A protein has these predicted regions:
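N-terminal Rossmann-like NAD(P)+-binding subdomain of aldehyde/semialdehyde dehydrogenases
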Residues: 1-125
């Protein structure tokens, strides 16, 4: 059985029941399923504006930069897995480079700018 792709919304994973089958552009085999559950966008907005905002405000700019750097490192360590998944969309490795390496590089760049250009604390004066 293929994996059901879930959505992380309002602090929890949503999507247990399979819906649309997703097929590989390489060989036509089933690779995953989209989930059947509806997403509650009002709940997502509320969560972001309350819980998410409080979480961000609890971190200073340097901590946020470190979180971006950690995410970039995590993704970079798994780039070959991401390339393998991306191939099933019909994209070549070069096509996927912009998203995978480019996205990771952008996270590292933002982390570096935040670490070097933003002050400690969470206010800019």
């Amino acid at each position: 059985m293929s994996t059901v792709l879930q959505s992380f919304v309002a602090g929890r994973w949503v999507g247990q029941q399979s819906a649309q089958a997703l097929h590989s552009a390489i060989n036509g085999k089933e690779v995953a399923f989209a989930h059947a559950e509806s997403l509650d966008f009002a709940e997502a907005l509320h969560y972001g504006r309350t819980t998410g905002l409080q979480g961000m405000l609890a971190m200073d700019f340097q901590q946020r930069a470190a979180a971006l750097r950690a995410l970039a490192k995590y993704l970079g360590e798994r780039k070959e897995e991401l390339y393998a998944i991306s191939a099933h969309t019909g994209a070549t490795r070069i096509d996927s480079w912009v998203d995978i390496e480019g996205g990771t590089g952008t996270l590292f760049a933002y982390a570096g700018m935040a670490a070097s250009e933003l002050p400690s604390g969470n206010l800019i004066h």
